[in-house]
Curated annotation (Swiss-Prot):
GO molecular function: ATP binding; tRNA binding; tRNA-uridine 2-sulfurtransferase activity
Species of the source: Thermotoga petrophila (strain ATCC BAA-488 / DSM 13995 / JCM 10881 / RKU-1)
InterPro entries assigned to the protein according to its UniProt record, in alphabetical order: MnmA-like, MnmA-like_C, MnmA-like_central, MnmA-like_central_sf, Rossmann-like_a/b/a_fold
Protein name: tRNA-specific 2-thiouridylase MnmA
Family classification: Belongs to the MnmA/TRMU family.
Cellular localisation: Cytoplasm
NCBIfam families named among the record's database cross-references: PRK00143.1, trmU
Reaction equations catalysed: S-sulfanyl-L-cysteinyl-[protein] + uridine(34) in tRNA + AH2 + ATP = 2-thiouridine(34) in tRNA + L-cysteinyl-[protein] + A + AMP + diphosphate + H(+)
Amino acid sequence: MKVGVALSGGVDSAVALYLLLKEGHEVKAFHMKTKEDEFFIRKEIKKKVCCSPSDTADAMRIAHFLGVEIEIVDVKEIFREKVIEPFKSDLLKGLTPNPCVHCNRFVKFGYLMDYVLNQGFDAFASGHYARIEFSEKYGRKVIKKGVDLKKDQSYFLARIEPWRIERLIFPNGIYTKEEIRKIAEEAGIHVAKKQESQDVCFIPDGSIENFLKDEGITLKEGDLITPEGEVVGRHFGYPLYTIGQRKGFKIEKFGRRYYVRGKIPEKNVVVVSDLEDVFFSGLIAEDPVWHVEVPEEFKCVCRVRKKSEEAPAVVKLRDNEVEVRFEKKVFAVTPGQIAAFYDGDTLLGGAIIKEGIR
């Protein structure tokens, strides 16, 4: 089989490439450039991020070592259009966006995958910790969680187009991270011990404030208020805060611990309240993407953030939205984040959280 592999320059994609070669596939590597190299040279890199010049060098070295052709693919234009601009826009709307989910949908498993398939490849592969399996229950291939639940990345795949699943391969999904590193070490791949990417690739210094400043937007301080309208402190720019956050603002009225309950962008206000006020009985999410056919009402488990606990829930479809009701209240349901839905370890799909239901 002819397989195009997304090679980031990290250990996961390197081992995915290696495993496919061992299985006898005809393989070519593709490396994305999401930003110009000068961007990473100018920025202070506080956390390991993907797509830097060193990652490109590593990807080329891996491909050379394994004896495969590599092509550098310029995705800067679509990355800005589909990831950076919506991220900026959502922040200013008071949302907490998840750029990695949008990158997967529109760039890696969108533009890049199309680019690969249009070259005549049979399948597209990456180093994600997830599995592609045929489901007897749903009568089609589905995405399942990776066996290493600590590293499972299925959540980030919740909004890719369902037809693409038929053409995807995730070789790493049946291994743990430790096993992947061991395979790399035994194969002599030089990135076997390379640090994982930990932050948003286009914010290598980890500062939302600096990102917005670079985009020509200066944050303004504003009032921190209770739901009753009492001013209890100051915030340093509403895009810096997310639901459930309890640090990073200036409290002027002490005696209570405050958590971010919501934001009012048009008034430059952040609303804070008690802990119990940031637990939610449900949510409304919009623009759902379903990988399988689902009924108008069904039970499943829902994850509202990458690291959130899975919550048993009832989902009701309505127009281009879904209403989700949890069995037990869930902490910090956050507009802009992704609600991913599972049947056991099978990913059913995902939608963008519009609002929490208290």
